Design a protein with these regions (language model features):
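Conserved PLP-enzyme active-site core in the AAT-like
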Residues: 1-169
Length: 169
């Protein structure tokens, strides 16, 4: 798909589902930067243990907590991580440039204090105000249980995958 005047971000799965194709994040990042667009990377399959998308040019990283991070599929959740590197002051991003009447005419891309990235700050505050969006305590607890074993699970997954690769070689 081509980048055009309506494009507002580039989105890529680091490891695609279901074919498990691996994206060239550095190349996709170069395209995003050339067009002045944020790169959003879904790193669910790689987990932060195996891949750090910000080191490859990602601006925003998303994960399904239900799969690898939680480790057991019993709790629903997701996470969005903003690297704080993208400049949201381009006129294409009107939600961040124009005054937001519902927040005392705050311009998200300009008026936030240092250390408050515009994208994630707006993403956290607006749904929280409008919907009360937050993860349930039970789901949070179950996901934390899975996070405790993430390093061990990833090491075992990698060791098992290497054994399969040698066998199939």
């Amino acid at each position: 798909a081509a980048v055009n005047g309506r494009t507002r971000a580039l989105y890529v799965e680091a490891i695609g589902n279901p074919a498990l194709d691996v994206a060239d994040l550095d190349a996709v990042s170069a395209i995003a930067k050339r067009h002045g667009l944020p790169l959003v990377v879904d790193a669910t399959f790689a987990t932060p243990y195996l891949l750090r998308p910000f080191e490859h040019g990602a601006d925003i990283v998303v994960h399904s907590l239900t799969k690898w991070l939680g480790g057991h599929g019993t709790a629903l959740g997701g996470i969005v991580v903003d690297g704080g590197t993208f400049d949201w002051t381009d006129s294409r991003f009107s939600l961040y440039v124009e005054p937001d009447a519902s927040y005392h005419y705050l311009r998200w891309g300009y008026d936030l204090p240092e250390g408050y990235p515009p994208f994630i700050t707006r993403m956290r505050l607006v749904p929280l105000r409008n919907l009360g969006a937050c993860i349930s305590p039970d789901n949070a607890w179950m996901i934390l249980q899975g996070l405790e074993t993430l390093p061990l699970r990833m090491e075992r997954h990698c060791a098992n995958a290497l054994k399969v690769a040698y066998h199939l070689k």
